[in-house]
Amino acid sequence: MLFRSYYYVIESGKCRVERMVGGVSMLLAELKSGDAFGEEALVSEAKRNATVTMKSDGTLLRLDKQDFVALLKEPLLQRISMDEARQRIAMGGQWIDVRYPSEYQYDKLPGAINIPLAEVRNAFGVLNQGRDYVVYCQSERRSSAAAFLLAQRGYRAFLLSGGLWNNPGARA
């Protein structure tokens, strides 16, 4: 995979982001100068889930995975313990469960809202930038990507360290 280990910033030009769903190409987003892509796969260490194609002539800047982690991922991700997360929630913060609806329905945390990772970008205009958000999933894989995306857009996002699997008393 050509783009697997890089984070890209569009210096100039326009791009289309598409994903194959049921054999049909679905337009997910149109990107322009200043926008970036590739962060979800690098943060969550997951497989790329979309194709980005230039719509016009342009220039892309790229960071390799090591530089991305050192310069962007680690400075933006704020991991917190379950105790600190509960304190933030008690002071008006909000749990965000980024798992699939079927997982959320089965064992969500009290008061949590469900915004699956694939929908996080769609929530940018709805969430309050003045509120603390504690993001979680089972293992920290999806939640780290979601917390990064939120923090990158200026939200006060915190990552539940270890996810639900490493916090067995979380649901109490």
What do the PLM-derived regions correspond to, one by one?
Residues 10, 95-99, 115:
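Short hydrophobic beta-strand that contains or immediately precedes a catalytic carboxylate
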Residues 25:
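Contiguous mid-protein beta-loop-alpha structural module that forms a pocket-lining wall or clamp
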Residues 1-2:
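Short, small-residue-biased leader/transition segments that mark boundaries at the very start
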